[in-house]
Swiss-Prot record:
Keyword Cell division: no
Gene: secA
Cofactor binding note from Swiss-Prot or TrEMBL: May bind 1 zinc ion per subunit.
Compartments (UniProt record): Cell inner membrane; Cytoplasm
Family per similarity comment: Belongs to the SecA family.
GO cellular component, one term: plasma membrane
Binding site residues for Zn(2+): 914, 916, 925-926
KW Translocase (keyword) present: yes
PROSITE patterns linked: SECA, SECA_MOTOR_DEAD
UniProt GO molecular function: ATP binding; metal ion binding; protein-exporting ATPase activity
Protein name: Protein translocase subunit SecA
Cofactor(s) recorded in Swiss-Prot or TrEMBL: Zn(2+)
SUPFAM superfamilies the UniProt entry points to: Helical scaffold and wing domains of SecA, P-loop containing nucleoside triphosphate hydrolases, Pre-protein crosslinking domain of SecA
Length: 930
């Protein structure tokens, strides 16, 4: 109450910011007449003038009014579009590192040109982030004309581009690309073996288009680069035979009394959390069955450390059978399991569930089981975008998530007023008892719109629902077009024409995002079609264009008179923001429009969160069949349910981020080390530090710290140094000859002997010949252990919640154990690198160079590299790295290269891990060749 009172007096934070920005808008408007008088060359010369002023110490904020005036004038000349004052406000919010909420149709793409131009003047690069390749291409070409006119370079960063083209795109003043591609380039840059192979420069400033989609909807799914891992096909098939023999328990047991179970069973299913849990009896039965199938040794428990993987596979098979259903969560097409996206209903071709779940579903369906992948590198969008020096975003719907943007990213949301107020009529929801009644009412509404000529956009949340509407409209004899997973290529064209008279378009949630629905149809597309028709001469084209313009004007006014675009939705999404996005398709730039949601008590959101309350209202009112309830209290109940779901989803994302922050800190350390190794001209100091650490640890196994001579095992230490490290030193003799020797002296003696042994090897061929080999051994070891570490963190994360039962804080336990694992990773790298460099037998610089090249090739040529990333529709896309596959094929690694490498590793013990980093024993890997 007090807050509202103060807001009325002083205005909200948003009002105060806009008031401040409006003063700058007045200064920009005052400059307009002066800039209009400039010639094209004079306007273009402003860019160099601004750069010179920055070099002399002026800030971007000092230049803002003039820079914005330059862009506005350039846009008038090149694009025939003048920035509105509200677009200048949006540009200032973006420059200040905030999120600008601008309604659909308010010109976000043009608004972005203002801060993009201003920040590009610094010469540090600006990244414009879009949700898909189509928009990146479209915006770069469309707005590129303006930037080029003003003397700035523009690059487009697309998937599968050759490395040289990517470097050129990132070297431009302004780079357009998708969020996924920027993130993957960052990960790939931290996997290269040559400094010149990196493509990105510093992460200076990014503007994220559709920021809610990228930083919230896609934030639960990390970017993952993976390669082929070990094959467990037989295990999946065997466990698939065990699972049908376990029975489901009906009812839930009260933890205090044990009552509540109606039918005893081996496992319970929790649909809300999407998990399956074995009961106590179920554990015993599962262990017995696994023993019968020879999967579990006699007397062993599923909880033994050695059987963690088996438990993991059993859980995946139970979830696959009881929580993932064919034609609802996935479809089987051409012998493959294809996931159906729960939000949009689109088929996610190429995407695979992780943690062995996809393979378990493949085993259940009896299709070919494809091998699991090993994660090579991974990052979440939260942690990638927080690497930028300055971040900003724009969207039509950010206000409902403003708290999350502030909490997670430190981004403030500024609501930019529309240029013209919307005339859209958002009608109250209509709630019916059954799904059948709901669809009948929606079809009747569509029929009425069609008969009077009003265009309709029908929004659905899944392919399944869009197909139901499609079938009902066909049955009703109403012509329409469907926009879902099967129509990707035509999305923008269909959406552009969805505003024509008598047009009925069915669209899943995010289809065709980024394209405006213009009442009467998109005239630009119509004119473009005429201009591209080579069969017409210029005079005919001009006449046809004039005719099309007249016809469009009539249609436009006619559709406006009917009430504009009608939005009909057949269910509420669990996020208010996505409902608002659907509504926002109508009533653009002051056009009329209307929207209505048709719901039933059977809808998932109603059933789980709001159904009982609304059903009670219906029963009290004694509603007859076919009648709907339409009241503010119902709409508010539904919005309250949505708020609960949004809060829950926010908590999930926040918790994920807190866990990911642990691996993010470790990722920064590893990537920093990698870059230092890549850029260093000489690695001898780093290698010496690793060697000292390794031999100190070795000595401490035989000569404990602060111990007396009687506790020392010098004979054992001598033997180990000779057998494992090739260092022959009469340690016992030296100690006996000396007057007084401490444990620290022993360490110094052994480290000196190791240094002398290594220096003698280096002196043989020269340090400069050795550096590249050292670099490759270091990078290979870091990469191999980092990948194993990522898998360990993943497994740790999955079981960490169980620590809560031991009265421990799972998050703290995760941090502690992850830190221990990271310490083990660094120790493993230290020991492995030292062992490889100490035991390698070197005869010539050429031989060492060949071995370094072979290590580099092995590091770069991982087979079947795939990229897993969320898309703007909520689906997760997985694609193969075609460039990588071509490079491997071209390299054609043969025995000659491997033979040279094997010779270089000739002093490695037969049962030791192979120095190439494959994880196999030396005798089963390169030892075969020596």
């Amino acid at each position: 109450m007090a807050t509202n009172f103060l807001t009325q007096i002083f205005g909200s934070r948003n009002d105060r910011l806009l008031k401040q920005y409006r003063k700058t808008v007045e200064r920009i408007n005052a400059l307009e007449p002066e800039f209009e008088k400039l010639s094209d060359d004079g306007l273009r010369a402003k860019t160099q003038e601004f750069k010179d002023r920055i070099a002399k110490g002026e800030t971007l904020d000092d230049l803002l009014p003039e820079a914005f005036a330059t862009v506005r004038e350039g846009s008038k000349r090149v694009m025939k579009m003048r920035h509105f004052d509200v677009q200048l406000l949006g540009g200032m919010a973006l420059h200040n590192g905030k999120i600008a909420e601008m309604r659909t149709g308010e010109g976000k793409t043009l608004t972005a040109t203002l801060p993009v131009y201003l920040n590009a003047l610094s010469g540090k690069g600006v990244h414009v982030v879009t949700v898909n390749d189509y928009l990146a291409n479209r915006d770069a070409q469309w707005m590129g004309r303006l930037y080029n006119f003003l003397g700035l370079t523009v690059g487009i960063n697309l998937p599968q581009m050759p490395r040289e083209e990517k470097q050129q795109a990132y070297g431009s003043d302004i780079t357009y690309g998708t969020n996924n591609e920027y993130g993957f380039d960052y990960l790939r840059d931290n996997m290269v073996y040559e400094p010149g192979d990196r493509v990105q420069r510093m992460l200076n400033y990014a503007i994220v288009d559709e920021v809610d989609s990228i930083l919230i909807d896609e934030a639960r799914t990390p970017l993952i680069i993976s390669g082929q891992a070990e094959d467990h096909t037989d295990l999946y098939l065997a466990i698939n035979k065990v699972v049908p023999l376990l029975t489901k328990q009906e009812g839930e047991a009260d933890p205090r009394t044990g009552e509540g179970v109606t039918v005893p069973g081996d496992f319970t299913v929790d649909e809300k959390t999407h998990q399956v849990f074995l009961t106590e009896d179920g554990h015993e039965k599962a262990e017995q069955l696994l023993g019968e199938f020879k999967l579990l040794p006699e007397g062993a428990s599923l909880y033994d450390p050695a059987n963690i993987t088996l438990m993991h596979h059993l859980n995946a098979a139970l979830r696959a059978r009881h929580l993932y259903h064919r034609d609802q969560h996935y479809v089987v097409q051409q012998g493959e399991v294809v996931i159906v996206d729960e939000f949009t209903g689109r088929l996610m071709t190429g995407r695979r569930w992780s943690d062995g779940l996809h393979q378990a579903v493949e085993a259940k369906e009896g299709v070919q089981i494809q091998a699991e992948n090993q994660t090579l590198a991974s990052i979440t969008f939260q942690n990638y975008f927080r690497l930028y020096g300055k971040l900003a975003g724009m969207t039509g719907t950010a206000d409902t998530e403003a708290y999350e943007f502030q909490e997670i990213y430190g981004l403030e949301t500024v609501i930019i007023p529309p240029n013209r107020l919307s005339k859209r009529d958002d009608q109250l929801d209509r709630v019916y008892k059954t799904t059948r009644e709901k669809y009948e009412a929606a079809i009747q509404d569509i029929r009425e719109c069609y008969e009077r000529g009003q265009p309709v956009l029908v929004g659905t949340s899944s392919i399944e629902n869009s197909e139901i509407i499609d079938g009902l409209l066909t049955q009703a004899g109403l012509p329409h077009q469907v926009l879902n997973a099967k129509q990707h290529a035509r999305e923008a064209d269909i959406v552009a024409q969805a505003g024509r008279t008598k047009m009925i378009t069915i669209a899943t949630n995010m289809a065709g995002r980024g394209t405006d629905i213009v009442l009467g149809g998109n005239i630009e597309k119509m004119i473009e079609a005429i201009e591209n028709d080579e069969g017409r001469d210029e005079a005919t084209k001009a006449a046809d264009i004039a005719h099309v313009r007249d016809e469009w004007t009539r249609d436009h006014e006619f559709v406006k008179s009917l009430g504009g675009l009608r939005i009909i939705a057949t269910e509420r999404h669990e996020s208010r923001r996505i409902d608002n996005q659907l509504r926002g398709r109508s009533g653009r730039q002051g056009d009329p429009g209307s929207s209505r949601f048709y719901l039933s008590l059977d809808d998932p959101l109603m059933r789980i969160f709001a159904g009982d309350r609304v059903k009670a209202i219906m029963d009290r009112l004694k509603m007859p069949d076919g009648e709907a309830i339409e009241a503010g209290i119902v709409t508010r109940s539904i919005e309250s349910a949505q708020r609960k779901v949004e809060a829950r989803n926010f908590d999930i994302r926040k918790q994920l981020l807190e866990y990911d922050d642990v691996s993010n800190d470790q990722r920064k350390v590893i990537y920093q080390q990698r870059n230092d190794i890549l850029d260093a001209a000489d690695l001898s100091a780093q290698i010496a530090a690793l060697r000292e650490g390794c031999f100190t640890d070795l000595v401490r196994q035989y000569v404990p710290a602060e111990s007396v001579e009687e506790q020392w095992d010098l004979q054992g230490l001598e033997k180990t140094l000779s057998n494992e490290w090739g260092i022959d030193m009469p340690l016992k003799q030296q100690v006996e000859a000396a007057e007084a020797v401490s444990d620290e002296d022993i360490v110094d003696m052994v480290v000196k002997a190791a240094n002398d042994s290594f220096d003698a090897k280096v002196a043989l061929i020269g340090q400069e010949n050795f550096t590249q080999f050292e670099r490759m051994v270091l990078l290979q070891s870091i990469d191999t252990h980092w990948r194993e570490h990522l898998a360990s963190l993943d497994y740790l994360r999955q079981g960490i919640h169980l620590r809560g039962y031991a009265q421990k804080q799972p998050k703290q336990e995760y941090k502690r154990e992850a830190f221990e694992l990271f310490g083990q990773l660094l120790d493993s790298v230290k020991n492995e690198v030292t062992r490889q460099l100490m035991t390698v037998r070197v005869q010539s610089g050429e031989q060492l160079e060949e071995a370094a090249d072979a290590l580099e090739s092995r590091g770069e040529n991982v087979s079947n590299i795939t990229y897993s990333a969320p898309t703007e529709t909520g689906e997760v896309e997985v694609r193969l790295d075609e460039e990588n596959q071509r490079r491997i094929a071209a390299a054609g690694l043969g025995l000659g290269t491997l033979g040279a490498e094997a010779a270089a590793f000739a002093r490695v013990g037969r049962n030791d891990p192979c120095p190439c980093g494959s994880g196999k024993k030396y005798k089963h890997c390169h030892g075969k060749l020596s």
